[in-house]
């Protein structure tokens, strides 16, 4: 009887000790949870995203630093610029693919990352405060889940000067909180994007294309500046790097990459052979063929498609610049910047091509590489204000050409 009583006492003591241990563990758990929650409140950062592979802490730090700066105003005072929302290590002597996009059009980065194997720099324009916030969330989500974004992409943000971008509140995770992979981020972006008519922002803010171009190519000795909805041919970056490694003599020469456009239903051609087959049946045509044939005609597409096939990328023939040619090109040396007074539609690229010509650059067309725009450019796909903007920029272009005479008084070339 006494032994039974002793056993029962020992059992109750053991049970009491176990209950006390459980209680202590629960208190410890609640304390840690409270501390973590307080850290979230303090940090005001992207803790609603799941843990990701290496460099995520660096991404968060860089985003925080870029946004905390408050940005800087552009020369006009109309736009606020946040440099280095995302940063990557870029060799200044590498060939950079520089592009620009509205927030909706960031979905095209997926195709660029697949085709362009080198460094890429993108300037993003957010027309509203909500878009600016979405851009910061996207920057983190893409770099968090896409290793190529972390390794190869620099991202900058531009918004109207009256807005300031800020780090999103972790209590409001939004559309991208539960995504787990790079493909999921791009799929989600494609679903929430609102494809619209070219340059129709739905606000009274002008799209600052030349400011965005300059920002994207800033600091690069060699850059191919393209629109985000264009895709380069496979291996173009490797071919350009090999050319650069062999010659290192690009100063004063603009290497023209022929540009085409394709019906949207078609798969993007990877090489010149595939492109030429589509070109011959009318599924691919010169860029801007339906809007401004002379704008690309000097490229001499008939000559280019009939060049003999070669394994190495090289300049094939020289083309004297003539108005209104606005080629896409890679150049080294002191390339003139894009004039940031040109906004919205009209004369924003030709003005820079014109200055290249006056500054003494020569144009040589590459034999194998090319660019393809997704879809045929058609007049009906532009916003109603296109013609008014074009006329405004046409007057500005005339003024710009007069200014070039004063800027290059010893140049025999004119536009």
Curated annotation (Swiss-Prot):
Its main location: Golgi. It is a single-pass type II membrane protein. InterPro entries: B4GAT1. Pathway: Protein modification; protein glycosylation. One of its GO terms (cellular component) is Golgi membrane. The keyword Transmembrane applies. Mn(2+) binds at residues 227, 229. It comes from the Eukaryota. GO terms for molecular function: glucuronosyltransferase activity; metal ion binding. The chain crosses the membrane at residues 9-36. Its EC number is 2.4.1.-. Interacts with LARGE1 and LARGE2. Beta-1,4-glucuronyltransferase involved in O-mannosylation of alpha-dystroglycan (DAG1). Transfers a glucuronic acid (GlcA) residue onto a xylose (Xyl) acceptor to produce the glucuronyl-beta-1,4-xylose-beta disaccharide primer, which is further elongated by LARGE1, during synthesis of phosphorylated O-mannosyl glycan. Phosphorylated O-mannosyl glycan is a carbohydrate structure present in alpha-dystroglycan (DAG1), which is required for binding laminin G-like domain-containing extracellular proteins with high affinity. This is Beta-1,4-glucuronyltransferase 1. The lineage of its organism: Eukaryota, Metazoa, Chordata, Craniata, Vertebrata.
């Amino acid at each position: 009887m006494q032994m039974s009583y002793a056993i029962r006492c020992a059992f109750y003591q053991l049970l009491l000790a176990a209950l006390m241990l459980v209680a202590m563990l629960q208190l410890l758990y609640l304390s840690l949870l409270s501390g973590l929650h307080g850290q979230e409140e303090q940090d005001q950062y992207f803790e609603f995203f799941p843990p990701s592979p290496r460099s995520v802490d660096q991404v968060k730090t860089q985003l925080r630093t870029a946004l905390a700066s408050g940005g800087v105003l552009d020369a006009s005072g109309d736009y606020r610029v946040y440099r280095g929302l995302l940063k990557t290590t870029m060799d200044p002597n590498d060939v950079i693919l520089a592009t620009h996009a509205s927030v909706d059009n960031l979905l095209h980065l997926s195709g660029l990352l697949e085709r362009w194997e080198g460094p890429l720099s993108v300037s993003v324009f957010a027309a509203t405060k909500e878009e600016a916030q979405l851009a910061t969330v996207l920057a983190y989500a893409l770099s968090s889940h896409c290793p190529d974004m972390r390794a190869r992409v620099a991202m900058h943000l531009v918004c109207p000067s009256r807005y300031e971008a800020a780090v999103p509140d972790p209590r409001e995770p939004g559309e991208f909180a539960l995504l787990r992979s790079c493909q999921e981020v791009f799929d989600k972006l494609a679903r929430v994007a609102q494809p619209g008519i070219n340059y129709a922002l739905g606000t009274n803010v002008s799209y600052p294309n030349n400011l965005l171009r300059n920002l994207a190519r800033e600091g690069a000795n060699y850059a191919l500046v393209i629109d985000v909805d264009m895709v380069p041919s496979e291996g173009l970056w490797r071919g350009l790097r090999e050319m650069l490694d062999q010659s290192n003599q690009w100063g004063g020469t603009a290497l023209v990459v022929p540009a085409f456009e394709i019906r949207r239903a078609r798969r993007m051609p990877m090489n010149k052979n595939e492109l030429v087959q589509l070109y011959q049946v009318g599924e691919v045509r010169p860029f801007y063929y339906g809007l401004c044939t002379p704008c690309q005609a000097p490229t001499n597409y008939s000559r280019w498609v009939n060049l003999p096939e070669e394994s190495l990328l090289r300049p094939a023939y020289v083309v004297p610049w003539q108005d209104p040619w606005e080629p896409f090109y890679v150049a080294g040396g002191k390339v003139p910047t894009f004039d940031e007074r040109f906004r919205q539609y009209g004369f924003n690229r030709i003005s820079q091509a014109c200055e290249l010509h006056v500054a003494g650059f020569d144009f040589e067309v590459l034999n194998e590489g090319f660019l393809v725009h997704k879809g045929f450019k058609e007049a009906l796909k532009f916003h109603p204000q296109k013609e008014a903007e074009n006329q405004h920029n046409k007057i500005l272009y005339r003024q710009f050409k007069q200014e070039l005479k004063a800027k290059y008084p010893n140049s025999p070339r004119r536009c």
